[in-house]
Swiss-Prot record:
Swiss-Prot/TrEMBL keywords: Amino-acid biosynthesis, Aromatic amino acid biosynthesis, Cobalt, Cytoplasm, Lyase, Metal-binding, NAD, Nucleotide-binding, Zinc
Positions of Zn(2+) binding: E184, H247, H264
Originating organism: Escherichia coli (strain K12)
Protein name as catalogued: 3-dehydroquinate synthase
Subunit relationships: Monomer.
Any one GO molecular function term: NAD+ binding
Organism phylogeny: Bacteria, Pseudomonadati, Pseudomonadota, Gammaproteobacteria, Enterobacterales
EC category: lyase
Keyword Protein biosynthesis part of the UniProt annotation: no
């Protein structure tokens, strides 16, 4: 069992990583006997895990209600958020309730925002079931829903009480979702840890076949890196912005193509190549290192080009609505070397468009 602590003073919390955690009531601390829980999951995961998690919580004396959401990025919306509020109010659940997010990034982000908002804030626990949510979205307290004009535009910083990562969930993950999660894994190597990127080049095949020790190390290292960044910059005023490598471009793809048509990790993968091409055009990143990124992404089964039907010009309106924009100016996360990156302002729109075009025709 691996245990990492996100250090945020009184709001510090553990990330527990192991197989078989759904069999142990102690995995879901700080829940105690007699407490009330709203378990939030989706229609795909409910048949796989709902009864199991409900059973282990009830075994611990917890009173469990549940709400099952539709599955897909397009349902990460205000309308679906309202169904969670309605379920909480109908039971009813008070300010002492705990929301448990059992699912991937959509369930986790939406449930976290519900917890941040319901009666001005109730406790919640993240139980991520996808690789992407286990290595990234469940850690750090970013919660949100989407708007038709932009991804994650309505949300709050709100930390969970704990994160429970059961590696067994990956056994039911579709290959496309596994690849999507690997995009965020590769991101950590590019922006923060060149040695980890090297390890990924050597061990990617083991991750693709869900080798237990390799996957446990991979998830632990990603969570360690994320925890360090969040502890240093919880509200993304500086260092934490680096975690958005590829996301400014990727969110544009998701919004333009319709949420759910491109998985988040797929869009981020293409976006990371666009960021690398931008950095190349600025003369601060080598084409050889861009090729290393492209090769690893392709091995993971990820796209390295944007959608053919989306012109370079179509990216700009979305990118100019990005949450990192300051005083009307785009701020891009750009690699300087494998393992080192920066937040860069003042890059001309023409250069960015040319970098995007490089990835459309490649």
């Amino acid at each position: 069992m691996e245990r990492i602590v996100v250090t945020l003073g009184e709001r510090s919390y553990p990330i527990t990583i192991a197989s078989g955690l759904f069999n142990e009531p102690a995995s879901f601390l700080p829940l105690k006997s007699g407490e009330q829980v709203m378990l939030v999951t989706n229609e795909t995961l409910a048949p796989l895990y709902l009864d199991k998690v409900r059973g282990v919580l009830e075994q611990a004396g917890v009173n469990v209600d549940s709400v099952i959401l539709p599955d897909g990025e397009q349902y990460k919306s205000l309308a679906v958020l309202d169904t969670v509020f309605t379920a909480l109010l109908q039971k009813p659940h008070g300010r002492d309730t705990t929301l448990v997010a059992l699912g991937g990034g959509v369930v986790g982000d939406l449930t976290g925002f519900a917890a941040a908002s319901y009666q001005r804030g109730v406790r919640f626990i993240q139980v991520p079931t996808t690789l992407l949510s286990q290595v990234d979205s469940s850690v750090g307290g970013k919660t949100a829903v989407n708007h038709p004009l932009g991804k994650n535009m309505i949300g709050a910083f709100y930390q969970p009480a704990s994160v429970v990562v059961d590696l067994d969930c990956l056994k039911t993950l579709p290959p496309r979702e596994l690849a999507s999660g690997l995009a965020e894994v590769i991101k950590y190597g590019i922006i923060l840890d060149g040695a980890f990127f090297n390890w990924l080049e050597e061990n990617l095949d083991a991750l693709l076949r869900l080798d237990g020790p390799a996957m446990a190390y991979c998830i632990r290292r990603c969570c360690e890196l994320k925890a360090e960044v969040v502890a240093a910059d919880e509200r993304e005023t500086g260092l934490r912005a680096l975690l958005n490598l590829g996301h400014t471009f990727g969110h544009a793809i998701e919004a333009e193509m319709g949420y759910g048509n491109w998985l988040h990790g797929e869009a981020v993968a293409a976006g990371m190549v666009m960021a690398a091409r931008t950095s190349e055009r600025l003369g601060q990143f080598s084409s050889a290192e861009t090729q290393r990124i492209i090769t690893l992404l392709k091995r993971a089964g990820l796209p390295v080009n944007g959608p053919r039907e989306m012109s370079a010009q179509a990216y700009l309106p979305h990118m100019l609505r990005d949450k990192k924009v300051l005083a009307g100016e785009m701020r891009l996360i750009l690699p300087l070397a494998i393992g080192k990156s920066e937040v860069r302002s003042g890059v001309s729109h023409e250069l960015v468009l040319n970098a995007i075009a490089d990835c459309q025709s490649a």
